[in-house]
Amino acid sequence: ERVTKSSAIFDYDKLNWLNQHYIKTKKISEIANMIIPYLNQLKIEVDDRTYLENILSLGVERDYNLKNIANSLTYYFIDKIDYNNDDYKKLNMENSKPILEKIIIKFEEIDFLDQSIINNNIKQVCEELSLKFKDVGPVVRFGLTGRLKAPSIDELCFILGKDRSLERLNSLKSFIS
């Protein structure tokens, strides 16, 4: 009797928020189970479940659905990063080469046993080059992922490991040469 005849409004923002909240409340192992089919659709096979769970622990709460989360994880699983994208155009590549050279030298000298070691070396590079992190961070993050938006650099390096991190940074250095 008291139902209106007007159409209901479906609020996608609220739905996305609710979905994001639901994802946040799940255990990482459950999210891993749910996300594997989405990764498979992207032609990514997950061989190491612990690796996937470590990646997911960096911040699944940043996205609001599993498809977006899967898309945001692709750089962890691919061997070659495509640097020729819109984010590349946003970087100042003239200043990037000395940053990359210095960070590569620093990373070659250390072991990636702890995130704080990685973080301290990034700070040292900033000091040695008389730059702020906002100048160094985006270049390193882009070198590791091909994107400007990603988890923190020390977390990325720790998950990717020393060899893959150095390989990607050297790859960007070659790309801009």
Predicted regions and their residues:
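Short, hydrophobic/amphipathic alpha-helical patches that form generic packing surfaces
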Residues: 17-21, 58-64, 75, 138-145
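Short alpha-helical linear motifs
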Residues: 18-19, 38, 76-80, 160-166
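Short helix-capping/linker segments at secondary-structure and domain boundaries
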Residues: 24-28, 67, 146-153
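Charged substrate- and nucleic-acid-binding regions of tRNA-handling and nucleotidyl-transfer enzymes
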Residues: 115-176
